[in-house]
Amino acid sequence: MSHYLLAIDQGTTSSRAIVFSAQGLPVASCQQEFKQYFPKDGWVEHDGEEIWLTTLQVCRDALARKGLRAADIAAIGITNQRETTLVWDAASGDLIHPAIVWQDRRTADYCAELKAAGHEANVSARTGLLIDPYFSATKLRWILDNVPGARQRAERGELRFGTVDCFLLWRLTGGRSHRTDATNASRTLLFNIHSQDWDEELLALFEIPRSLLPEVLDCAAEFGVSEPSLLGAAIPVLGMAGDQQAALIGQACFQPGMVKSTYGTGCFMIQNTGEQPVTSKNRLLTTVGYRLDGKVSYAVEGSIFVAGAAVQWLRDGIKLIDHAHESEALAIQAGDSNGVYLVPAFTGLGAPYWDPKARGAIFGLTRDTGIKEIVTAGLQSVCYQTRDLLEAMRQDGTPPSALRVDGGMVVNNWMMQFLTDILGVTVERPEVTETTALGVAYMAGLKAGFYRDLDDIASHWHLQRRFAAHMAEERRGELYAGWQNAVRRVRSEA
């Protein structure tokens, strides 16, 4: 009997595979980093073949590490960096252009034109999103208009579009399945979150032929079956969700009002709002939290473009540290950033500012400033940006009393304590922090019969540590005011 679930977690800087038991515990994993390419200012690309090859390799290696065969795996779940856009030949499966990553800002001018023409209100009403280079539609249009012959080939039905989940599914199934799920579709700027279908008016606005687009399924569904030659036997793909929605599921945030925040390359805070979509007055996004049996649970989301990427920049860009884990020890030594603020607007600012032309800066440098203070400011910048999102949720009338956290950065205890101090709310870290992969494993397991329902899944969530705020309210206000001043100074309209 097949006792395990294989979760593919394809991220912005690495591909991972984690094997989970039926109890939701990781039993084997493998991870491979791959390269990001920055061909021009504000452009971010991936080699789609590297995405596929690293994904396939980590799946094979994860099974090998536990001594498992494909027959031991009941189902595969796929979770992924969202919005990243790929286009490939329908016959050969060959990509026609590098993947354009969610961080890429090349379409900022086109987005500004659409806003100036008055399209944003209609687009937002249909999709829950804002017109921004972050989302897939303008990236896809750019590929069609800038790769020779691409638009003509698309109109002839010769090309396929997909976000990373869809592309991996196509490759895993040998080109037999061109499908995505409702969470990934909801991030394209082409999907109507009310009708739960591709929106013809939006396809016309962005000039996207419908033949490019995949079929949209629930998060727990029969997506396809893997090619036997890839992993040693055919395995059904039964779960799919974008990375942040997968983390919402993995954190068992199934009740309206529950909030999770994931700290990876970026930071993403999502709050479950239940069966009705809630429109934010503070430029948060309305999105699909998950869809099961055709029934949607909606969410509001705040997206921060640079979180862990700030630490990567400190390591790789200006080489202040050799390893990311050094940041915690340096912050403990420093105790405080001593008035230094790092605003990591390397590719603009996300929610609630949505300023693609903002650029990063460091403020408050003195003769006494050293590596410790700058690294500490980098960690604090992630917490301040989380406070920006929390304030937006509060102003929308949905203040969370606790925040469930996950992702690679949450092992940093110093940062978690500063986070709870600057937010003024309890921060809860679960036993299993790889909740993105866990969430999609849950979806695959739900379809495979491992779990009865969402209550059954929620019973597997366990708290590892709760962080409580100790900072005085006056000090919290002073620090956050300094951050707000720093952000004002990097805004494009400043």
From Swiss-Prot:
Residue positions binding sn-glycerol 3-phosphate: 12, 82-83, 134, 243
Functional description taken from the UniProt entry: Key enzyme in the regulation of glycerol uptake and metabolism. Catalyzes the phosphorylation of glycerol to yield sn-glycerol 3-phosphate.
Catalytic activity: glycerol + ATP = sn-glycerol 3-phosphate + ADP + H(+)
Natural source organism: Pseudomonas aeruginosa (strain ATCC 15692 / DSM 22644 / CIP 104116 / JCM 14847 / LMG 12228 / 1C / PRS 101 / PAO1)
Binding of glycerol, residues: 82-83, 134, 243-244
SUPFAM superfamilies, per database record: Actin-like ATPase domain
Domain of life: Bacteria
Alphabetized UniProt keyword annotations: ATP-binding, Glycerol metabolism, Kinase, Nucleotide-binding, Transferase
PROSITE patterns membership: FGGY_KINASES_1
Top-level EC class: transferase
Residues that bind ADP: 12, 16, 265, 308, 408, 412
Region forming the signal peptide: none
GO biological process: glycerol catabolic process; glycerol metabolic process; glycerol-3-phosphate metabolic process
Regulation acting on activity, per entry: Inhibited by fructose 1,6-bisphosphate (FBP).
CDD domains: FGGY_EcGK_like (cd07786)
Pathway of action: Polyol metabolism; glycerol degradation via glycerol kinase pathway; sn-glycerol 3-phosphate from glycerol: step 1/1
Entry's EC annotation: 2.7.1.30
Family: Belongs to the FGGY kinase family.
GO cellular component: cytosol
GO molecular function: ATP binding; glycerol kinase activity
SS bond list: none
Residues reported to bind ATP: 12-14, 265, 308, 312, 408
Record-given protein name: Glycerol kinase 1
